[in-house]
Amino acid sequence: MDPETCPCPTGGSCTCSGECKCEGCKCTSCKKSCCSCCPAECEKCAKDCVCKGGEGAEAEAEKCSCCQ
């Protein structure tokens, strides 16, 4: 497995390392800022991020609860 990728099952927890990049992550909890649903500007609060929302440009802004 590539060290910069990790499994992020839908509805599962994201417990990968800080260097990890989760592709297409749809986690219910995100302990690290690795989840793609947490935009870069929300990295500081991604610790408690809850990934939500659908796909597409409009949904991007609504995906990450830590941005609210």
UniProtKB/Swiss-Prot annotation:
Residues annotated to bind a divalent metal cation 3: C16, C20, C25, C30
Molecular function (Gene Ontology), one example: protein kinase activator activity
Claim: Cell membrane is one of the keywords in the record: no
Positions that bind a divalent metal cation 7: C51, C64, C66, C67
PTM annotation (Phosphoserine): residues: S33
Source superkingdom: Eukaryota
Binding site for a divalent metal cation 5: C35, C37, C38, C51
Region (Alpha): 31-68
UniProt-listed InterPro entries: Metalthion_dom_sf, Metalthion_dom_sf_vert, Metalthion_vert, Metalthion_vert_metal_BS
Single GO biological process annotation from the record: intracellular zinc ion homeostasis
Modified residues (N-acetylmethionine): M1
UniProt similarity note: Belongs to the metallothionein superfamily. Type 1 family.
Protein name, UniProt field: Metallothionein-3
Organism, as annotated: Equus caballus (Horse)
Gene giving rise to this polypeptide: MT3
